[in-house]
Amino acid sequence: MRSGVIARKVGMTRVFTDAGEHVPVTVLQIDQCQVVAHRTTEKDGYVALQVGVGKAKVKNVSQAERGRFAVAKVEPKKKLAEFRVSEDALIPVGAEITADHFIPGQFVDVTGTSTGKGFAGGMKRWNFGGLRATHGVSISHRSIGSTGGRQDPGKTFKNKKMPGHLGVERVTTQNLKVVRTDPERGLILVEGAVPGVAGGWIQVRDSVKRKLPADVPLPGKFRENGSAGASQIEAAPEAPASEENA
């Protein structure tokens, strides 16, 4: 079981196949999705990865969180999430998961916060049929009708479907096909609609109901956090030169 990623929903567009057929896709962008911490069986009782995405202002991060980010040697992240993984799918702390972590043709499950609709009636919220258009019905064409019985039970039961707030809920859409990836720009194009508004955070993980392709990268596709290491490698050859000059 591999790790997922946190992406930001950019919007929808369409791409064309070789046969000229257009495919509606949702564009998801990964903005420096890095592994922040490990969760292990010995310490936490389960195995998971904590990943973070986006840049957070230091003033908006608590001192305890700053310490955890410093230990992981990553910048403070705006959004954090945990993904359960298997023991052999642990990605090193500080590594950045790239868009080619997913491959075209595989299926993924996406989770986001649905678009808020405000206060909605029964027909929009629960797909009620409404009342008649004629035959004595006036004004109440879109009302929900009766909400309970008579003297017995003499009340409206809890969880009765009625008008109320619609949207802003955690929604998961399963089995969306990955059409294309662009690792350089951090883009993942998935077929169909993804819950949430443009700019919202989306969690993308391997589908739980579809078989994982054989050529999918394990434990994942990522680049090591080598900014500090690169500077040391560049500085190493300069040391002998300074000694010779001395």
From Swiss-Prot:
Disulfide bonds: none annotated. One of its GO terms (molecular function) is structural constituent of ribosome. GO terms for cellular component: cytosolic large ribosomal subunit. Residues 234-246 have a biased composition (Low complexity). One of its GO terms (biological process) is translation. Residues 140-162, 214-246 are annotated as: Disordered. The modification N5-methylglutamine is found at residue 151. Methylated by PrmB. It holds the Pfam family Ribosomal_L3. Keywords: Methylation, Ribonucleoprotein, Ribosomal protein, RNA-binding, rRNA-binding. InterPro entries: Ribosomal_uL3 (IPR000597), Ribosomal_uL3_bac/org-type (IPR019927), Ribosomal_uL3_CS (IPR019926), Transl_B-barrel_sf (IPR009000). PANTHER family: 50S RIBOSOMAL PROTEIN L3, LARGE RIBOSOMAL SUBUNIT PROTEIN UL3C. Part of the 50S ribosomal subunit. Forms a cluster with proteins L14 and L19. HAMAP family: Ribosomal_uL3_B. Belongs to the universal ribosomal protein uL3 family. One of the primary rRNA binding proteins, it binds directly near the 3'-end of the 23S rRNA, where it nucleates assembly of the 50S subunit. This is Large ribosomal subunit protein uL3. It comes from Methylorubrum extorquens (strain CM4 / NCIMB 13688) (Methylobacterium extorquens). The lineage of its organism: Bacteria, Pseudomonadati, Pseudomonadota, Alphaproteobacteria, Hyphomicrobiales.
